[in-house]
């Protein structure tokens, strides 16, 4: 099932990136297509705890491609205001990594922040493709 979602995500992303509306700069308005929604992997191992209280739903995240990562050749790091939070999950990063390698500009933002009583945290975010339309 996870493999089917990964393949579907890759097909949808490739199709969307192939369709790129172009307009003169003065005629552009912002639009976007959400490519995937993910939980941050490795959240407890990085800086999330130190910045947790400052993060808000809607905050922009920075996706950083780590092609030389020794543990995962498709690694995509997730940062908030220059603080490393974790990674795009290994099971969901191939299509995003491939598009970043091709020079496509994908963006991300926080969609949900959850803290449990046992101090575990979950950060959900969406990866999206910014578009311009006439």
Which residues does each PLM region occupy?
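Conserved active-site motif detector
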Residues: 2-134
């Amino acid at each position: 099932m996870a493999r089917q979602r990964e393949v579907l995500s890759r097909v949808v992303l490739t199709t969307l990136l192939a369709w790129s509306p172009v307009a003169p700069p003065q005629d552009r308005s912002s639009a976007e297509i959400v490519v995937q929604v993910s939980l941050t992997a490795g959240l407890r191992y990085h800086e999330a705890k130190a910045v947790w209280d400052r993060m808000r739903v809607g905050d922009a995240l920075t996706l950083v491609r780590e092609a030389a990562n020794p543990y995962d050749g498709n690694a995509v790091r997730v940062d908030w205001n220059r603080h490393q939070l974790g990674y795009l999950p290994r099971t969901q990063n191939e299509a995003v990594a491939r598009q970043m390698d091709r020079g496509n500009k994908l963006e991300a933002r926080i969609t949900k922040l959850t803290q449990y009583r046992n101090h575990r945290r979950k950060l959900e975010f969406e990866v999206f493709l910014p578009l311009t339309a006439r």
